[in-house]
């Protein structure tokens, strides 16, 4: 996606503003002349990458829930690139939606959100403990607060062209990052299809670069939230990405947005992409022939481990200034209770953070009549063994969030890959930026 014109941090400077005064006149009810106003619940979330999900959620689910709970529920959908600015605007005005969905952990807005501890506890009572990925993405161990609630996440498998990799001796696709480098170079040379991993200021690049870092044993922080970016392992990851770009890719990746790899893969232009199953689902509908050629594999092995990130972490927040806090909490608990329906409506895009809500998940993804072949999505059955959170091996804290949303690591890798800076220079610049960011949030007491 394009670089945001105004960062979340810049907007948050305005959060000291008090709640807007509300006139009383509209709330006066004359006995015998009017009924109590119907409750309302206002939700904002992204335009889902699987349109069938929005069709179900917007036109069916919220209406049914509203009728059962005597509440008028409305939902506003905006593109993922606009979420941060919209959230910052609501915080600045101290007015907006009751439920706001981020597609990544949002710890920088913790001071503006309601603690979700009771929602987590109720869902845990009903469905057992949430997955560790959900806790690491929504809980602050420093303040002991759940600043958000995550009902689901999206796996981030490797999408690859099976026909092309088969012709360079890898019929089951790449199993390691070195396979991508070697196989990708051969494919580009023989067939002209480059590797399609972004090096731009957008979310897919942010996830892919961290995946490569973590596989190399490099991390932004340690388990206790101490900065650890400046390491031999990070330098090796940067050098690897530089070589990967030079040997397998094309300069267009420097200007990609979050959907560029989707479009390029479906158009038959690239050999590999790291993305959710939105690529394969779209291909099934738009081009069944290319769909048969695109297959999935698990997280790739690096020098240290095989690991991948979540592609989307669904994190709902309830603002402290929300008008229907209790209704918003009940909506989330009920949504988790109905998550199997959501899982099916989203065509397996969103996986449950409470695993008992979809007890037959493995069976469902192992035999999908829409897929080519029907067991294409079976590869995701053990996703929790290789998927992790932004900020691994620590929590997704406020410093990690700011580093993520200001594209510090994206820029680090892009500068080195393009030759704008040496790997050492790019790392030094990123380390300096991260030190400032960690220092700021430690001073605020949130890290």
Language model region names:
Residues 183-186, 224-254, 299:
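Glycine-centered hinge/linker elements that transmit conformational signals in sensory
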Residues 142-151, 156, 181-227, 233, ...:
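Extracytoplasmic/periplasmic solute-binding protein
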Residues 39, 63-131, 163-175, 264, ...:
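Extracytoplasmic "Venus flytrap"/periplasmic binding protein-like
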Residues 50-72, 409:
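Short, polar/charged alpha-helical segment
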Residues 102-157, 211, 293-300, 376-383:
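Hinge/lid segment of periplasmic solute-binding proteins
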Residues 4, 10-31:
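N-terminal export signals
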Residues 278-291, 302-407, 445-446:
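C-terminal lobe and pocket-closing loops
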Residues 41-58, 154, 204, 395-401:
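Extracytoplasmic "Venus flytrap"
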């Amino acid at each position: 996606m394009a670089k945001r014109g105004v960062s979340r941090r810049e907007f948050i400077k305005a959060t000291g503003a008090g709640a807007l005064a509300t006139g009383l006149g509209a709330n006066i009810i004359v006995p015998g002349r009017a009924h109590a106003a119907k409750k309302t619940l206002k939700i904002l979330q992204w335009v889902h990458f699987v349109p069938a999900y929005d069709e179900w959620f917007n036109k069916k689910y919220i209406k049914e829930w509203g009728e059962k709970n005597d509440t008028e529920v409305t939902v506003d959908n905006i593109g993922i690139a606009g979420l941060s600015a919209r959230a910052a605007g609501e915080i600045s005005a101290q007015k907006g939606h009751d439920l706001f969905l981020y597609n990544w952990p949002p710890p920088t807005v913790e001071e503006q959100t309601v603690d979700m501890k009771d929602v987590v506890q109720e869902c845990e009572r009903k469905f057992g403990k949430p997955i560790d990925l959900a806790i690491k993405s929504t809980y602050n161990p420093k303040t002991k607060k759940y600043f958000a609630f995550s009902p689901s996440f999206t796996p981030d498998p490797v999408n690859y062209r099976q026909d092309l990799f088969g012709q360079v001796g890898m019929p089951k696709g790449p199993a390691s990052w070195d396979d991508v480098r070697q196989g990708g170079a051969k494919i580009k040379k023989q067939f002209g299809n480059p590797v399609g991993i972004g090096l731009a200021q957008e979310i897919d690049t942010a996830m892919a670069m961290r995946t490569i870092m973590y596989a190399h044993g490099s991390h932004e922080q340690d388990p206790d939230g101490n900065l650890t970016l400046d390491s031999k392992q990070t330098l090796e990851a940067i050098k690897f990405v530089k070589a990967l770009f030079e040997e397998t890719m094309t300069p267009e990746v420097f200007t990609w947005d979050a959907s560029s790899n989707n479009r390029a893969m479906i158009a038959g232009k690239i050999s590999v992409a790291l993305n959710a199953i939105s690529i394969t689902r779209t291909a099934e509908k738009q081009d069944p022939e290319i769909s048969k050629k695109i297959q999935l594999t698990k997280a790739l092995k690096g020098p240290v481990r095989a690991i991948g990130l979540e592609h989307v972490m669904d994190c709902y927040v309830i603002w402290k200034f929300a008008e229907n806090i209790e209704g918003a909490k009940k909506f989330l608990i009920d949504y988790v209770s109905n998550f199997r329906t959501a899982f099916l409506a989203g065509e397996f895009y969103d996986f449950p953070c409470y695993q008992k809500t979809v007890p037959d998940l493995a069976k469902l993804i192992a035999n999908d009549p829409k897929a080519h072949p029907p067991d294409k999505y079976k590869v995701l059955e053990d996703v929790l063994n290789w998927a992790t959170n932004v900020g691994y091996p620590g929590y997704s804290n406020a410093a990690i969030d700011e580093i993520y949303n200001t594209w510090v690591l994206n820029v680090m890798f892009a500068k080195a890959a393009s030759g704008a800076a040496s790997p050492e220079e790019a790392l030094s610049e990123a380390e300096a930026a991260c030190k400032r960011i960690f220092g700021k949030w430690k001073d605020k007491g949130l890290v």
